[in-house]
From Swiss-Prot:
S-S pairs: C26-C169, C324-C356, C507-C539, C545-C556, C550-C565, C567-C577, C931-C958, C962-C975, C969-C984, C986-C996, C1210-C1251
Molecular function as annotated in GO: SH3 domain binding
Domain F5/8 type C: 26-169
Family: Belongs to the neurexin family.
Extent of Basic and acidic residues compositional bias: 1319-1329
Primary location: membrane
UniProt organism field: Rattus norvegicus
Signal peptide from the UniProt entry: 1-20
Name of the molecule in the record: Contactin-associated protein 1
Gene Ontology cellular component annotations, sorted alphabetically: axon; glutamatergic synapse; membrane; paranodal junction; paranode region of axon; presynaptic active zone
InterPro entries documented for this protein: ConA-like_dom_sf, EGF-like_dom, FA58C, Fibrinogen-like_C, Fibrinogen_a/b/g_C_dom, Galactose-bd-like_sf, Laminin_G, Neurexin-like
Distribution of this protein across tissues and organs: Predominantly expressed in brain. In myelinated nerve fibers of the CNS predominantly found in paranodal axoglial junctions. In unmyelinated nerve fibers of the CNS diffusely distributed along the entire surface. Weak expression is detected in ovary, pancreas, colon, lung, heart, intestine and testis.
Glycosylated residue positions: 121, 129, 277, 421, 500, 519, 598, 654, 665, 764, 805, 844, 861, 949, 957, 1079, 1148
Motif (SH3-binding): 1329-1366
Amino acid sequence: MMSLRLFSILLAAVVSGAQGWGYYGCNEELVGPLYARSLGASSYYGLFTTARFARLHGISGWSPRIGDPNPWLQIDLMKKHRIRAVATQGAFNSWDWVTRYMLLYGDRVDSWTPFYQQGHNATFFGNVNDSAVVRHDLHYHFTARYIRIVPLAWNPRGKIGLRLGIYGCPYTSNILYFDGDDAISYRFQRGASQSLWDVFAFSFKTEEKDGLLLHTEGSQGDYVTLELQGAHLLLHMSLGSSPIQPRPGHTTVSAGGVLNDLSWHYVRVDRYGREANLTLDGYVHRFVLNGDFERLNLENEIFIGGLVGAARKNLAYRHNFRGCIENVIYNRINIAEMAVQRHSRITFEGNVAFRCLDPVPHPINFGGPHNFVQVPGFPRRGRLAVSFRFRTWDLTGLLLFSRLGDGLGHVELMLSEGQVNVSIAQTGRKKLQFAAGYRLNDGFWHEVNFVAQENHAVISIDDVEGAEVRVSYPLLIRTGTSYFFGGCPKPASRWGCHSNQTAFHGCMELLKVDGQLVNLTLVEFRKLGYFAEVLFDTCGITDRCSPNMCEHDGRCYQSWDDFICYCELTGYKGVTCHEPLYKESCEAYRLSGKYSGNYTIDPDGSGPLKPFVVYCDIRENRAWTVVRHDRLWTTRVTGSSMDRPFLGAIQYWNASWEEVSALANASQHCEQWIEFSCYNSRLLNTAGGYPYSFWIGRNEEQHFYWGGSQPGIQRCACGLDQSCIDPALHCNCDADQPQWRTDKGLLTFVDHLPVTQVVIGDTNRSSSEAQFFLRPLRCYGDRNSWNTISFRTGAALRFPPIRANHSLDVSFYFRTSAPSGVFLENMGGPFCQWRRPYVRVELNTSRDVVFAFDIGNGDENLTVHSDDFEFNDDEWHLVRAEINVKQARLRVDHRPWVLRPMPLQTYIWLEYDQPLYVGSAELKRRPFVGCLRAMRLNGVTLNLEGRANASEGTFPNCTGHCTHPRFPCFHGGRCVERYSYYTCDCDLTAFDGPYCNHDIGGFFETGTWMRYNLQSALRSAAQEFSHMLSRPVPGYEPGYIPGYDTPGYVPGYHGPGYRLPDYPRPGRPVPGYRGPVYNVTGEEVSFSFSTSSAPAVLLYVSSFVRDYMAVLIKEDGTLQLRYQLGTSPYVYQLTTRPVTDGQPHSVNITRVYRNLFIQVDYFPLTEQKFSLLVDSQLDSPKALYLGRVMETGVIDPEIQRYNTPGFSGCLSGVRFNNVAPLKTHFRTPRPMTAELAEAMRVQGELSESNCGAMPRLVSEVPPELDPWYLPPDFPYYHDDGWIAILLGFLVAFLLLGLVGMLVLFYLQNHRYKGSYHTNEPKATHDSHPGGKAPLPPSGPAQAPAPTPAPTQVPTPAPAPASGPGPRDQNLPQILEESRSE
């Protein structure tokens, strides 16, 4: 409904504007058709650079004289026009162009108004070369006859060069002039008027601060009033009031400032129902009218400029308007035109003129850093008298400086802290200083009169009677030769103006020196005095605090070219009062180390809602936010019915319903206890009918379930557990008994809380009564901080475009391992043909986070660079970016802010028309791969999880791949999250491959063996000493089994359903430890083998003592395990069948203390226990042998028995605790390190083999790692625009031309194919009967004449060799005829 109404407002505005103001099609080029006399300039450089050559696309261009101190180009449009755009070019084929300029306009050549762009910036950007046309479409259309362009900067390699185009249309002006005692009224044609929509529009200009512009009213309290108060425009409107309506209808809105500047200001009011717009000079203020009515009921007339007749008594305190009003439009009726025509429905009060009679004071604009105006005076007079008028916003500035004659000293008038300070310094005497006035920097005109003569001085401000300041002091006055207004020139020694005051910035007029009015026209043309950096006949003051760029009710204070914001008592901070001062929840205070108490929170951050005070119940694991209200005590209700129910509104302390709703919406859990007691009063009545009583929650939604129940069902708590008094009912109170019953419980559905009203409707019977009781709202948690989403390649989320007006702040956390990607981007409509506004935050490189934007000043970016670490380290990083009219800044984590101040008068309007992309740039370019969470834009959290779509590559949360992997990591591989996929870390396994599923083995020839040193003798001694002190072995705790705690761990060869007993959890590697990690209280051994020979030793672990471990094949081909722990050996027969069948076999042995777990192939897991006489430790492991034992020292005879001739076959997947010798041998890059080369030795031929094992699954290549990957619906992105259309037409034209040429070539070359033409005469028919031809004469044979045929010409027979006959000698010879047979 809201969007429909706003659309209707815009539609009404367009229709009314098109008919009443001529906007439609107002785009004519106005300079080209003008005569040469309409183009003028301050000067010209040469004969072919005069103003007449300044037309757009002309053969030359205008250039002023070198040294012209105030160059300008002026256009006389011959009549008033509406102007909508201006375009510039440089001088043709030259290095002369203007880079910045000012646009002035007016109705006469001696009074100019600067055009201010949005942001109160009077400077337009110009050209960068001599040929390109730079066009500026103005944000509002103004009316003028004269246009003046003032160049401010130009190409430093050339000079000023300009060609100009102005776009608009003719404008019909109907002007009414009021002198303060005049007024007119317009009577409706059909008496009273009633309307759903209205449009009021007009233009005005004045020098007064107060005045009534328009007024109309009705008998039912309806009225519309537009007036000036303090040079601000005020709109008062009401759609009526009624005693039965609870809300008053009066609404007042304000716009603009310093509107008494004698410039035309355009006003427009659009209303549709209660939705309304107030437009002033292009700035639109949208608002909603108070009250409940939607139609405007007016009596029979509208008053313009004041009140007429008896209506004056209604607004007797209002001043009539003094100034000019133009084209007053009411609902497509031009009242001003009717007044000019003296229509019968127009009533006049006083002498209303039909042309402007405003004075022309010729002001001077002081806007430069070293501006001044110097005028001569009458020297050596005994009385110094100066007067002038000024207006400014600045607190300080030099108003006047004059050096006294005869070296007596000087006189200074300066503005300081809003008052005029006078300083008279004389040689040999104490300086005289005094002040006058108060708050003279208010932007209005103030008149200063200063007189100094012998022994006394006097100054008066604004000719206020009795307010002048008189000072008696011994003075000797002799006037000097020069008076400096607005500042001192540089260097001061040359001009004799020595003042340490800053230059004055503002406007001055009516300068008088020694009682004589200064002729400023002579000053402008250098015929009197001197000046620098000033503009004549214009005043460029503007109200930079209207509209107010200080947010959250911050106070705006302005100077000549800037403004500042004071944010005290607002709850916000920053240059525009945008940044929240308080934390968003009690949970944030808990995390910062606070204790329970009252705190101020701001749930929506920098959003529009105000902060408020709550009680924070801070506990160890959570913080409860408690919001109290005015219904904490029992409320009794009687006499209510369903027709006239009781409305129990809940007013929360220190907060509105919207602010409390924002708290609940941001919380993880909320609850509110509600209790309803009844005496002969019903609650719900039936489960399907409309209830007697209910409660209203967030967004004014009605809810029919009560405490302890669930949303969507019309029940109380007893209705869920079937414990109501009457089992057939769903609430205790529905029993309707003459005794007190109660339904109570907690309301816990967050999206419905808080409770805002309780409606009770069944207490109108005799002796019936109801009571309700509501406890405070209690919430905890923060569901916005962990609103997380994961992105895969090419995925992105689309949200509605940013609507941020003048400020935008973005904050979010990201986590990624990708080197680059765009976090978010929003593009807007084009500024011009080649540029579009945008805002983008991205990870540009692994060490750079960039905030890039274009708000109209070109591409700009801020970069946070990291030297100490990379941002793609798979850790969470906080990004905060902010942009407003004062500055742009960026911060990552706790690094310092990267800040860039905006140029003065920068305007930002961050309302885009394209979708906001999260996770990529527009059209899914430069996608981000990783996780984002807690993304906020101006305090509003984007629901990332709610937009997650697995089919498009986005998933909620930042984990999940390793929790439920598609293929697990085998053999103890560690699962590593990679956002759009996962990888398996196989470093601690004896396998490789994507899922640690590829066997790494070696084929052992007879006599081949491998040794891997587990530790040196020195480390063994250290280990023994550590064991004696009962300290944990470096790297692992007792009972460690590698991979046991790894997500996705699948024990190799343990078979289905295998689970290790609950022994102590493994330890973690010690940082900095680099040697092989061992464990004396347990081992885990796994490997595969295949062989056809026996006996052999497959694996042997030796020690520096007599302990060892061995797995061997006996003579009969069976597999045996031998342990030597302590003094006595332990022998276990692993298989009873031979394993020398040439097939792969797997072995997995795990020992934990005296418990031994064994699995061979896929046979069931067996468990063995060592005797208590056997030690539980494998002391001082020394080396690991594969294929054959080549250990020195004493070796068990049984091992020696099976050690010769050695193993012949294949071993793979060998792992002893964390040692994988075959993987180390085959996968370590060459050359090896010296330490590793010393630890590992191979004797004989050992070649890599997987021993015939097949991988468990076919590995897949993730999209990010596949260079040839394309998504299923890979789009083609292009941004060629209209260039692509032109290229398409050009290619089509060339193809058509080529086809046409081929067709013509074909027709030309095959036109006569198969035929020939001759010049033979037609055959002569004889007169013989039957039409037979005569016989040929005797002699040489002749070819018969061809017989005519309609479709074929027969080929003649070849002539004989003797040549043609006599009759054929005159015929043309044909090539075929000349050939012989």
